Design a protein with these regions (language model features):
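Conserved glycine-centered short motifs in functionally critical loops
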Residues: 1-58, 63-75
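C-terminal intrinsically disordered, low-complexity extensions immediately downstream
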Residues: 71, 77-93
């Protein structure tokens, strides 16, 4: 059964690309800390390995993005917060 109401299935790689676009937009305008809350499986994909996606973002944007796993999130759900814990973006598939 498809969990989406509109019947569309979005590939996980597109969600990661959407995350990067959001991060890029924020980091080009602001200099503060950035926190990405996401499902533990997505967190593992973004943080594991020598050249993880998190490390690639650091090299590309010269700013560390802290990635926090949230068990209560759906698989492709994520939220982006600034240093003041203000929610910048919320996405749920």
């Amino acid at each position: 059964e498809n969990p989406n109401k509109d019947g569309e299935i979005l590939a996980p790689i597109f969600v990661v690309e959407r995350m990067e676009e959001t991060i890029k937009d924020f980091l080009t305008k602001n200099k503060g800390k950035l926190y990405l809350h996401t499902h533990p499986f997505v967190e593992a994909y973004l943080t594991k390995g020598l050249m993880s996606q998190q490390m690639k973002w650091f090299i590309k944007y010269k700013k560390w993005v802290t990635i926090i796993p949230r068990d209560s999130f759906k698989y492709l759900e994520y939220r982006l917060y600034d240093a003041d814990k203000k929610e910048l973006v919320s996405y749920s598939n």
